[in-house]
Amino acid sequence: MSKFSESTLSGWTKPASVTEEDRIENTISMIKSAIKNDNNFDNLVYEVFVQGSYGNNTNVRTNSDIDVNIMLTSTFYSKYPEGKTNSDYGFTDGTITYNEYKNLILTALTNKFGTGNVTVGNKSIKITSNSYRVEADCIPSLLYRNYEYENSSSPNNYIEGIKYFASDNTSVVNYPKVHINNGIEKNNQTHKNYKRLVRVIKRLRNKMTAENHFTNENITSFLIECLIWNVPNNYINDYDTWDETIKQTLIFIKSSINDNSYKNWTEVSGMFYLFHNNRKWTSDDVSSFVNSLWSFMEY
């Protein structure tokens, strides 16, 4: 048995407070209003949605920021099967560049929130918080249609992702909606316990950090969500207490690293390997985290 009571662990499985939800919803509403009321967007088709911990319903911090994607869909990027081009799908060149679109968003947000409350970061446009709203990272992106993944020849059959460019001109492609949908599916398969387990592990990480038991910035909330995503459902479903569920989850992760099966793990989207392509985290980071959490729990 760990040093934490079952009631404490159960409490840590819950999402952020209701009052925080109100500030988050205010922020989202204001961002949508900023874009909708700007005439520059009248002839553009776009979608505003939340991604990250709040979008995935795994947020735990009472003063957390949110990630808001402002995705242009009337002009988009595509990835085609080998030998295919725009013309095979009946597409023509887009009417706006990424930088032009990003600048329109920056102007709209600045007009809404004020110059002093909006700054441009490397990958997002940041909006400051106040008593009414939370801090927001707004990501201007273009729809990314991946036809290659399923070797699709139909213009309407693709994996939906996003593409954007950081300020250092690095291109970024990811699949936040696939991530959200896959997380919902696993949560349903585990009687809602997948996201509860993610939240309790996040809170334990935060507590370890606050108490100087473990500090590693590479153990991100995104990584924790992905690690638990790769834990088989029976490890999440089959135990009667959160204490035992956490213990068995740590055993599985550690065993998978020891036998190298972790190399086949993917992000929640299933579109990228979790430990390939020079990721900021390594298996050594995760091993250290698991060992520290094991000792922190006093197993």
Swiss-Prot record:
Residues the entry annotates as binding UTP: Q51, S53, D67, K123, N174, F222, R279
Record keywords, A-Z: Antiviral defense, Magnesium, Metal-binding, Nucleotide metabolism, Nucleotide-binding, Nucleotidyltransferase, Transferase
Cofactor list: Mg(2+)
GO molecular function: metal ion binding; nucleotide binding; nucleotidyltransferase activity
A GO BP entry: defense response to virus
UniProt remark on cofactor binding: Binds 2 Mg(2+) ions per subunit; only 1 is seen in the crystal structures.
EC number of this enzyme: 2.7.7.-
Record comment regarding domains: The (R/Q)xW motif controls pyrimidine nucleotide specificity in the donor pocket, while conserved Asn-174 is important for recognition of uracil in the acceptor pocket.
Family the entry assigns: Belongs to the CD-NTase family. E02 subfamily.
Complex and partners: Monomer.
Protein name in the entry: Cyclic dipyrimidine nucleotide synthase CdnE
Source organism: Enterococcus faecalis (strain EnGen0062 / B16457)
